């Protein structure tokens, strides 16, 4: 009941999050409304720019935050691999990257459809009963916390403490990944959840 109430309160801060195609790895394809992304399995002909991730299947949201409280939900469906969270606007976009707070990423994810991890150093294994089809993410900048929730079970999954950073590091942006680049891609989309469904 405690987490049910907590999640309900956080959902009041739900905002509109759109994915930024200019940051998306060339294998990733966004829908026209910018609310979902999938791995096409092929390198698409997209404009090169400094914002684009070129070595991992990552992308960021268009909107960034420097203050306040913000909540969003992502439907991961039946995907076996994914990662979600936030990244500093200043993160490196080119070459091999490691998802970790010291590199400007506060992220949790799923590997092999069975194991859930917080990408700390070293990784922290998360205890999750069953599948996680929908993830709630709550960013409280004044409290310096990022929390993940199992929306279906209304249960807390993990909370990061965000290190104090200077304004030079820029905004915090929602982060998304469809997982490792494999030869046989999982083409199911990651989708932004538009409303709050009390039944889920």
Q: What residue spans do the PLM features occupy?
A:
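Beta-rich ligand-recognition domains in immune and ubiquitin systems
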Residues: 1-200
């Amino acid at each position: 009941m405690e987490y049910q109430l907590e999640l309900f309160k956080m959902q009041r801060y739900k905002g509109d999050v759109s994915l930024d195609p200019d940051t998306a790895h060339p294998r990733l394809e966004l829908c026209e409304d910018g609310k979902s992304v999938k791995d096409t399995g092929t390198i698409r002909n997209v404009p090169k720019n400094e914002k684009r991730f070129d070595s991992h299947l990552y992308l960021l949201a268009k909107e960034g935050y420097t203050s306040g409280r913000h909540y969003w939900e992502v439907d991961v469906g039946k995907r076996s691999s994914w990662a979600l969270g936030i990244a500093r606007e200043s993160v490196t976009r080119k070459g091999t990257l490691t998802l970790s707070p010291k590199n400007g990423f506060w992220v949790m994810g799923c590997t092999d459809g069975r194991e859930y991890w917080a990408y700390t150093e070293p990784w922290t294994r998360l205890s999750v009963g069953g599948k996680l089809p929908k993830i709630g993410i709550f960013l409280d900048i004044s409290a310096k916390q990022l929390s993940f929730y199992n929306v279906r079970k209304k249960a807390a999954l993990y909370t990061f403490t965000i290190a104090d950073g200077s304004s030079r590091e820029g905004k915090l942006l929602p982060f998304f990944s469809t997982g490792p680049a494999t030869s046989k891609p999982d083409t199911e989309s990651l989708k932004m959840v538009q409303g709050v469904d009390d039944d889920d």
